[in-house]
Amino acid sequence: MEFKVLEETKTKLVFELLGETHTFCNLLKEEIRKVKGVEIVAYRIDHPLVGVPQFLVETKSIEPKKALQSALKSIKKNAEEFKKEAAKL
């Protein structure tokens, strides 16, 4: 996965996630949406076979990069909890 910032301001972040598909992008979008202060989060993939996911995050009371970091930490925590539970099977 490669992260490429296309546009960044105090309240807006546009970035690409090279090498990712809808699977991870939907998860990331939903986790960013849960972060307090996020106004808009969306992504698009222009072509289903060769397109690169492009995200838009707009915030009101938090820096967009901090919202992204918070969402990624949440995903990591949930994955670790799932791994522990799966090991019990």
Residue map of PLM features:
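Protein-protein interaction/assembly regions in multi-subunit complexes
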Residues: 1-89
